[in-house]
Amino acid sequence: RRFLHTRRNKNLVENKNVYTSSKYIIDDPELDAIDGGLGLAPMETDRAGDEGSPLSFTLSVLDIPGATVETFHPKAVHLYGNTLYVANDAPGHYSLEVFDVSSGNVRHVKSMVEWMNGDKKETFAGEPNGVTRSYGKIYVTNTGSRTDVFDAETYEFITCIGTGTWGEGGYQTVHAFDVTASQGAVFIRDKRKLVVVLEQDVQPGSAARVPIYSRSVNLQEAMGTYAVAARNDGFLYVTAQNKNMIYLFDPADIRAGDTGFAPYLVALGFEKSPQSIAFVGDRLFVTLRVDDKRSELWEISPKNGKLLQDFTDSMVYPEKIAGARHTLLVVDRATQTVKAIGL
C-alpha cells in the first residue's frame, strides 16, 4: 500500500523532480506505527560538534594573515567542536575561513577560495551567506543558487546542491541563504521556500544533480538575510524577515515531491524583522533588524517569541548567528567581527 505514496524516479526527465508524489496518498495509521509515517524517516542528528566547554573570544581581520578590511567581511559562522567556520562575502574575495579554537583562542587554519570540481577550477558562484557541518561534510550556501559541499577533513570539493541557475527544477534552488542539517536531511532556506535534501543523496560525482526531496509552500519571495535552525527535537525555525515572522515546521509534515509542505500552526511574530536565529541547547536567539545601521540580539521564548533577555549590549549590527558548545556566535556586520559569548 505504501508504495503508492512516493517513488524515486530513476528515468528522470531533465531537471524534473526525482522524488514524485502519488496522486493518491495513503494515510494508514497501522503502517505509520511501523515505519514512522509518510514524512521524513527520522535519522540520528550529528551532535559531535556540540561537545566542549563554552568559549569567549572576538575574531577580527587581525586573525587572518594577509587579510585587510577590504578582503574580509564576515557574513555567517558555524562552530563544530574545535573548528570554527566563517563565510566571507567581501566583494571579489569570497571565501570560507577556517579556524582552530582548541586552545580557547582563535588560530587561522585555512582560506578556502577555490577548488577543483573534476578538472574544472571553481570559486563561490555568489556571496557566501550560510555554513554548517554534518557527518564529515561542510555545506556553504551562496546567492549564486548553489550550496557547495566539501570534505571536512581534506577540504576537497564533494558536490554541490543547486545548478548555479535559479529555479525550482528537480536539482535547483532559488539562490540560497542559509543551511542546517538535522535528522538525516539538509535544509536550505532559499529566496522563496525551505528546500529539503536527503543527506544520503549528497554524494561525490553528483555535482549540480543532487535531487531535491521536497519544498515548502512559498514564504513570500524577497532578497535579504535569512536563517533556518533546528530545535533538539527536530522542529525547524525559519525566518521570513519581509513578513516579520519566524515560521515553525514539523518534519513529520514534510512529504516527498513538490507538493509544498506548510508551516506548523504556530508562528512567531515581531514588530521588527528577524534576520537570523540560533539554538544554544534549548535556548533560542534571534537578531532583529532596526534599520540599515542597527539591529538587536535577543533571547526569546521558543514557544511564543517573547523577549527573555536583550544581548545587544555593545554590538552595533549583529546579523547572522550560530550556537554550539554552550556558546553563541555572533557576526557584527558593523565592526566586521565574530564574537563568541559563553553561556
Q: Which stretches of residues belong to each language-model region?
A:
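Conserved core beta-strand positions within WD40 beta-propeller blades
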Residues: T83, K137, A185, F235, ...
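Blade-level signature of beta-propeller repeat domains, shared across WD40, Kelch, NHL, RCC1
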Residues: Y317-L343
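Conserved beta-strand positions in repeat-built beta-propeller and related beta-rich domains
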Residues: V86-G92, V140-S145, I188-R192, V238-K243, ...
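Beta-rich, blade/repeat-based domains predominating
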Residues: T68-Y80, W115-R133, T165-A181, L219-N232, ...
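Short loop/turn segments that connect beta-strands within beta-propeller blades
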Residues: D100-N105, D151-Y155, E199-P204, D250-R255, ...
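N-terminal secretory leader/proregion of peptide precursors and effectors
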Residues: R1-A48
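Structural motif
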Residues: H93-E97, R146-V149, L194-L198, N244-D250, ...
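Surface-exposed loop and turn segments in beta-propeller and other repeat-based domains
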Residues: E44-V69, H108-T123, I158-Y171, A208-E221, ...
